[in-house]
Amino acid sequence: MKIAIALLACLGLAAAASFHQTHEVKIADKAFLMKQKFLFEIVYRVEDPLMFEDHIKQGEKFYFEESYYTHYDMYMKKFFEAYKAHALLPKGEFFGALVMSHAKQARGLFNFFYYAKDWETFAANVAWARMHVNEGMFVYALTMAVIHRNDFHGLMLPSIYEIFPQFFFNSKFVFEAEKFDYEMWMKMTMYEKEYMDVYYKTNGYDYSTMYRSSDYTYMKDFKTWQWWKLMGLGEHWYTEDKFILRENIYEFNQETKWLSMMKDVKKFYMPVDYTRDLNLYNKESKLSYFTEDLGWNAYWYYLNMDYSFFLDGNTFDLKNDRRGEWWLYNVHQLLSRYYMERLSHGFGEIPEFSWYQQIEMGYDPQLIYYNGIGYSFRKNYYEMETYANYDMLDKITGFLKRIHNIVEMGYYKTADGHTIDLRKPEAIEFIGNMLQGNVDAMDKMFYQFWYMLAHMYFADADYYQMDVYPNVMLNFETMMRDPMYYMFYKSIAQVYFQFMHYLPKYTKEQLLMPGVTMKNVEVSDLTTYFDLVDFDVTNMLNDKMIFQDGKFVWDMSLFARQMRLNHKPFTYTYTIESEKVEKVVIRAFLGPKFDEFGKVISLAENRMNFMEIDEFYYELKAGTNKITRKSSEFYWTVKDRTTYTELYYYTMMAFDGKYDFPLDISEPHCGFPDRLVLPMGWQKGMPMQMFFMVVPYVAPAHEQFSTFDYTYSCGIGSGARYVDSLPFGYPFDRAIDEYEFFVPNMYFKDVSIYHADTMEPYYKYKSYSNYGHFDYTFFNDYYTKYFKF
């Protein structure tokens, strides 16, 4: 179970304990638990009719009257009018957050949730919307309301991949999950056992020789990532009678309350992989384990919930967080991370995007919407121009030309005659707002809708179309699966680099920290591997829900058991000499050393490929400072989140007075997966480089974590999320003069990333004696603090 110290590490506070006071764990009271219980139940099987009688009664009325709200605007009025005219997006239809007609209705619904004066009004509206509003729109609006309401700190929803597993797993798996029936499963298991007993006794085999080297069934369609075949398992449901696979499960499976809580839950898992398993569509399919990773996609989803394009900076205080710069910097960082993963497979630069040339890499997401309609796919060498909406294309390309032109000119004159200087570093905020197409853009007439139109164009959705075919590019939680996403967003990042090109390069005097020298940095071994994890997909169950004395009995859970990239914990130790006591910030970056041809990339070019992995405050003493930093302490990363099943059980136990529910029981929604910090690397070692820099502490307007509780909140809009006020990515944010760049308070370190094949023991004939059963003897050690290769 998470405790405050664990989150301190995840948020990069451990090394700054002298600067930020420690924080005691807060325990939820009865009122909080009532609200948390409501939120968990209201999204349970969200595509099915609501079955909780208490919530059905709560939702008998929707409060449309202005007196129930702190603010009442045009979008709320339009939503109400659409409801009266039966013009809302129907339940069961595909919802796209980047479909213009859908987004306008979602904004109205969000406002009804966000501006509700009290919990009673909010809960009534949510319960009503759960029964009457499109499921996708409902979850989208509810997620943003829970994140942004100031009186909801600590409240949470299940992860988006637990609410809608259909958006993250292939249609074959979804079909098996939705038709799962416990009684039928029991019968099939019994029949299979009887059949196998007869078969092997008749043929004189025993279970230790269930396959031979001549068995075609063992070798056919074999792929090295198919761990279930290596263990002799099929793609169907198995009972999970030991423990849920998760990297931090050792925190739970030794706790008596957790064991007692979970013993009555029937747990089942089914092996599932990525699109590469069903079809190697093109070479990009090799990267599907990364681009379709649940944590990778969820990070982008929550970033765009935190800083949604229709939330204005003044009302929601997003301007305090440098929302435009932060969004654009995240685009850059995600592209850098993706590029490093490409290098692990010998792929080169992310291809350039063109509106008028073929898109070489097609994509088939193999997803199915919960209404049964499959997602559209794109063929290899697809020509978008052939199927274009030319009016929409003109608007999109016109925007891009306009923004490139104003960056080159160095200023912009708005429609009301105001001139903005684009040669100042802080102008990156305006550029970021324009590129995101958010409501804080300088001229809403020109810049607000281009981003949405671009995604609609990719999905062949018209301006006012309501009935839209499912497409991954229309929702934040699915778009990063598509290789075209990275091509298109590379063109967005190029505007960022174009803007930075016109800013003056940092001089040696600006980069130098007098009296401080970084003498050495020792980095431990960097090793990646593929582990297995269970994702909670219980929301896809279709069996009858059981209630006893009015209480819901959660007696069964389904899990998707999936292979995913991870890394061993690593550390680095700084040796820094200082002439006096100094308040500093230490930054760490990871970047490539060579391109796909083995050629060294110059620093002037390579700066765009570095990804910042750590940043923390420290007080140097006079003399030599030895500072050890663990990978678990990185400021923006999180471990595996507690599953939906466990969170609901913890809530109910606490509600009944049998458990103290800590508000930091799960990880903050905004964190980047710790396990994806390192690219896969090579078995022989992939050469990379790390960059470290110590800079003077430049205090932000609000001291980090001073205005929100960092143990369970992301502090969106607080202005206190960042350790200092330097530009994001400093000193790689601007072009580099290599004659001026290198100073004593910097340090470059050549490193190698090794990849260990954890499945190798199963490749050999008869190397696994328990063939036909999951190997808990190996994974029991695998999921402990002491796991070693």
Curated annotation (Swiss-Prot):
Gene Ontology biological process: energy homeostasis
Subcellular location: Secreted, Extracellular space
The keyword Transmembrane is annotated on this UniProt entry: no
Top-level taxonomic group: Eukaryota
InterPro entries on file: Di-copper_centre_dom_sf (IPR008922), Hemocyanin/hexamerin (IPR013788), Hemocyanin/hexamerin_mid_dom (IPR000896), Hemocyanin_C (IPR005203), Hemocyanin_C_sf (IPR037020), Hemocyanin_N (IPR005204), Hemocyanin_N_sf (IPR036697), Ig_E-set (IPR014756)
Cellular component, GO, one term: extracellular space
Pfam families, A to Z: Hemocyanin_C, Hemocyanin_M, Hemocyanin_N
Gene Ontology MF: a single term: nutrient reservoir activity
Tissue/organ expression: Larval hemolymph.
Keywords: Secreted, Signal, Storage protein
Signal peptide range in chain numbering: 1-16
Listed transmembrane segments: none
Stated family: Belongs to the hemocyanin family.
Oligomer and partners: Heterohexamer, composed of three subunits, alpha, beta and gamma.
Described purpose of this protein according to its UniProt entry: Larval storage protein (LSP) which may serve as a store of amino acids for synthesis of adult proteins.
Annotated protein name in UniProt: Larval serum protein 1 beta chain
